Amino acid sequence: MNKTNDPVDSVAHREPQAVVKAYSENSIWRNRDQFAVGHAEIVELLTKKWEKEKDYRLRKELFCWHDEKIAVQFWYEYRDALDGMKWKRCYGLEDWTFDVDGRMRKRQMSGNDVELKDGDRWFVEGKSVEEVEIGDKHW
């Protein structure tokens, strides 16, 4: 199993019920300033998140790992449905802790949004997010 890309793939479909299958029943989440414990709360958190974040394009890179823990760096772009559909990019880090069965038991995300001007988008239609050169300034 590719633990870095599997969550990316399930998120791309934006189906909270499918996403939570990768998490333990009592998984603990922090997503920015929101906290969730267990599948029902995670589904609620994801539903609200994706009501806000439209046309979501995500890229994650392995940052480091040790035993049952992984950290990833990510960038994603979206249109903010709660802010006039402005394009934004989120820069952030996540740390994940896995159970012995391979499901994630803890996920913590810290991210910062930057409003994008015309022409600033990286993850445009017709181009894979993996093709985008992300310069040192953004690493």
Where are these regions (language model features)?
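A short gly/proline-enriched turn/hairpin at secondary-structure junctions
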Residues: 26-37, 49-54
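Generic alpha-helical secondary-structure signal
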Residues: 3, 22, 41-45
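A beta-strand edge to alpha-helix "cap/lid" segment located at domain peripheries
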Residues: 44-139
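Amphipathic alpha-helical repeat scaffolds
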Residues: 5-9
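Short, well-ordered alpha-helical segments enriched in acidic and aromatic residues
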Residues: 13-26, 30
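Eukaryote-specific detector of the first structured module of a protein
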Residues: 1, 11-14
